[in-house]
């Protein structure tokens, strides 16, 4: 694949995108007008056509803070719910990492500009897992799970997002900052469920730990394997967990941790599960493992209904991104290619090469949204690799 990368990049720059036969806007519109194509199918195929024609543009990073160095390499990015803020983890040459928030409202303008706020430098500490947390309001905090080091124990830390953005007239004051001492965590998830209000979960070695932030109360659920991926369902009282053994199981939050009645749905992969995404209705789940297998599960029938082919993963913790509004699944492989599939049908819509040669140290981190930059934003993909940000907007 690396030998094909320069040619693919050149074709993308020249906007020479090839789509499936019949997948062009005039043809689809004509079929819809003649009644040969139902409106729902027309909308779905139109979205897929736009995804296959995404165009790459470099994003200009304009810093308000001298400490936000543009030379720091992106390690991970994580967009909030509205996709108007981007939490970033940047690798520092001297050791350790910088954590910060980028305002993305500038993505709605033709210039494609973003603005980093002040950063927090943490020397010699590694974050194994992170997610946005809605403590005071939607995405008010960041939940970071730090690995222990020497005499410094591992912990889960809730950082208010306002800590990074700073103080401006009319802005909220920094919210609650708190830390919980826990064993080294492989994964974490914040609950939006009424059955675990103001709570988060951490996936540990052969254990799931559920913590209430307000009361400090903790519940432990024993497992037979390390828990590498987690997500709370919103519509149902379940916490889903993906394990190193390949098992996926749900914890019924109504049952407590006594006995074995808390273990609900059980599914299985052939390798370690690295990512879980529950669809909004709570009836379907997308999961991936360390063999590159990505599956869509029907949770009511407890069976796989769709498989997404082409993802490359041999040993890494790589996330899978699901956007139901656009009807797509996106994932970056160890080969540094970003692939986007149709959520419903599973066929590959587009393959995006990295702007840089493939390397284990240069695997892109991406975010996909229907509204990049906020409410008035356009659909597309945001990619962070090395020191650069790229936006792949719909054509």
Curated annotation (Swiss-Prot):
Coiled coil: none annotated. GO terms for cellular component: Cul4-RING E3 ubiquitin ligase complex. Signal peptide: none annotated. Keywords: Repeat, WD repeat. It comes from the Eukaryota. PROSITE patterns: WD_REPEATS_2, WD_REPEATS_REGION. WD repeats lie at residues 268-307, 312-351. Gene3D superfamilies: YVTN repeat-like/Quinoprotein amine dehydrogenase (2.130.10.10). PANTHER family: DDB1- AND CUL4-ASSOCIATED FACTOR 4-LIKE PROTEIN 2, DDB1- AND CUL4-ASSOCIATED FACTOR 4-RELATED. This is DDB1- and CUL4-associated factor 4-like protein 2. The lineage of its organism: Eukaryota, Metazoa, Chordata, Craniata, Vertebrata. The gene is DCAF4L2.
């Amino acid at each position: 694949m690396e030998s094909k990368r320069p040619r693919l990049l050149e074709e993308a720059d020249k906007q020479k995108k090839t789509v499936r036969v019949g997948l062009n806007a005039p043809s689809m519109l004509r079929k819809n007008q003649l009644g040969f194509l139902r409106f729902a199918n027309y909308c779905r195929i139109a979205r897929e056509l736009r995804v296959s024609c995404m165009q790459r543009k470099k994003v200009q990073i304009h810093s308000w803070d001298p400490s936000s160095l543009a030379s720091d390499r992106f390690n991970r990015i994580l967009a909030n719910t509205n996709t108007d803020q981007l939490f970033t983890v940047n690798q520092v040459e001297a050791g350790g990492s910088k954590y910060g928030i980028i305002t993305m409202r500038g993505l709605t303008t033709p210039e494609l500009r973003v603005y980093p706020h002040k950063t927090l430098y943490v020397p010699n500490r590694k974050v194994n897992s992170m997610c946005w947390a809605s403590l005071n309001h939607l995405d008010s905090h960041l939940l970071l799970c730090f690995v222990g080091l020497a005499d410094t124990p591992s912990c889960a830390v809730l950082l208010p997002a306002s800590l990074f953005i700073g103080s401006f007239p009319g802005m909220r004051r920094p919210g609650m900052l708190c830390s919980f001492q826990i064993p080294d965590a492989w994964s974490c998830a914040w609950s939006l469920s009424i059955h675990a209000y103001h709570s988060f979960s951490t996936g540990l070695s052969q254990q799931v730990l559920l913590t209430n932030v307000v009361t400090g109360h903790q519940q432990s659920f024993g497992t037979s394997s390390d828990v590498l991926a987690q997500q709370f369902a919103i519509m149902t009282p379940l916490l889903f967990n993906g394990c190193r053994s390949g098992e996926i199981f749900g914890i019924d939050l109504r049952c407590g941790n006594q006995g074995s009645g808390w273990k609900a749905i059980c599914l299985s992969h052939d390798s370690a599960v690295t990512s879980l995404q529950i669809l909004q209705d709570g009836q379907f789940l997308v999961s991936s493992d360390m063999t590159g297998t990505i599956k869509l599960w029907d949770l009511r029938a407890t069976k796989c209904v769709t498989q997404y082919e082409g993802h490359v993963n041999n040993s890494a913790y790589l996330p899978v991104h699901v956007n139901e509004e656009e009807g797509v699944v996106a994932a970056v492989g160890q080969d540094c290619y970003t692939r986007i599939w149709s959520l419903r049908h599973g066929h590959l819509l587009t393959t995006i090469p990295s702007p840089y040669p493939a390397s284990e140290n240069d695997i892109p981190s991406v975010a996909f949204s229907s509204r990049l930059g906020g409410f008035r934003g356009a659909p597309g993909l945001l990619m962070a690799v090395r020191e650069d940000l790229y936006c792949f907007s719909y054509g």
